[in-house]
A protein has these predicted regions:
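Phosphate-binding site recognition
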Residues: 1-122
Length: 122
């Protein structure tokens, strides 16, 4: 329950940064994000473990002005800052996606972005 509370608080915050959830496998990280995603107009879920080909999108320019249209086209879903959630699941499988979080914060802070993964080391 605490996770839902904090994610909801994060969702409503005007001074929001991309969120990175770390934890052991099978503890409910993805579930809590999907449940939070229901509060948005839409959610694009990128699972780097199930769809490794998506890593190619993150192999070049990591700017949101490039990534947002590419992900929208690939998943056939609109990513609208302030209305959409971009969920980068199993993010440890794509180190470039982890790097992209910085650019989402700097260049497109209105887009809600959550990364989740296990075995993340910093």
């Amino acid at each position: 329950r605490k996770a839902y509370y904090y994610l909801n608080k994060w969702r409503k915050s005007s001074d929001r940064k991309p969120l990175l959830l770390r934890g052991a496998r099978q503890v409910g990280k993805s579930h809590v994000v999907r449940r939070t995603g229901a509060q948005f107009s839409n959610m694009v879920e990128v699972n780097f473990e199930q769809r490794p080909e998506v890593r190619k999108i993150f192999s070049g320019d990591l700017s949101p002005r490039v990534l947002i249209p590419a992900l929208s086209a690939y998943f056939n879903a609109e990513l609208t800052p302030g209305k959409s959630l971009l969920f980068l699941d199993e993010i440890q499988e794509c180190p470039e996606a982890i790097k992209s979080l910085r650019y989402f914060y700097e260049e497109c802070p209105a887009l809600h972005v959550i990364g989740a993964g296990s075995l993340l080391e910093f």
